[in-house]
Amino acid sequence: MKGKEYFEKLMFTYASQDVPLLFDFNVVIANLNKVSSNEAIKLIAQLRESIKISAKANEDYAIQYATIPLVGRTIFEQQKLLYNSLLQWLDSFEAQMSKE
């Protein structure tokens, strides 16, 4: 198989796959009920801070590489939306957890 043909096959393979959304921090979330409430609050706060730091880094990269083609810029936009969604989800989760 030649280079371009192999490249196109790879592109179609990845475009046709399930889109996994597995985050390493889900291990922390899944085990928060095994630590004290105080510790859980600290872990949630640390997770929020980590997401904010990652979002800021993504924003900085988007500014730094603002002149790249749309296909690259749109990845920064996608990541921005994901970080914002994660922060909203974390707020909701924390509110629900505080009621339990």
What are these regions (language model features)?
Residues 13-24:
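A eukaryote-biased feature capturing mid-to-C-terminal, repeat/solenoid-rich segments of large proteins
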